[in-house]
């Protein structure tokens, strides 16, 4: 999958830096859903290369159903694992409203991967997975 990244960087005298990204790419979850996600992300990397990342995303799945989420991470620059939170949801994703889920992200040349993995009940799974046929 192709990912578009537009970024801006401020570098401080101690080599720490503040970066912003405007990304669009492909996402998938552990219920069989997938689609396109647009994210606005900021990260601060201190002089010890420790990272604090915050972002907000708008996602459309393969059936044009939407949700919005926040991202937080304190790991690698171009890849890492963090926490996402569903902050607004539509239709079948309403069952995830307010839920926090781990995610993994990896930017690679010419593409990217964003994977959500939520722990949910059987009832929630039936709601989220039943419309994927």
Question: What function would you assign to each model-found segment?
Answer:
Residues 1-133:
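Beta-strand-enriched cores of mature, soluble protein domains
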């Amino acid at each position: 999958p192709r990912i578009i990244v537009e970024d801006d960087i401020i570098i401080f005298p101690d080599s720490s830096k503040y970066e912003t990204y405007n990304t669009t790419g492909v996402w998938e979850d552990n219920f069989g859903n997938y689609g396109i996600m647009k994210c606005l992300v900021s990260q601060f990397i201190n002089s010890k290369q420790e990272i604090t990342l915050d972002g907000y995303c708008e996602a459309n799945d393969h059936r044009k159903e939407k949700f919005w989420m926040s991202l937080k991470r304190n790991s690698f620059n171009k890849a890492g694992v963090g926490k996402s939170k569903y902050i607004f949801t539509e239709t079948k994703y309403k069952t995830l409203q307010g839920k926090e889920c781990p995610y993994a992200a990896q930017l690679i040349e010419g593409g990217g991967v964003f994977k959500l993995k939520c722990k949910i009940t059987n009832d929630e799974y039936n709601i989220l997975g039943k419309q994927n046929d």
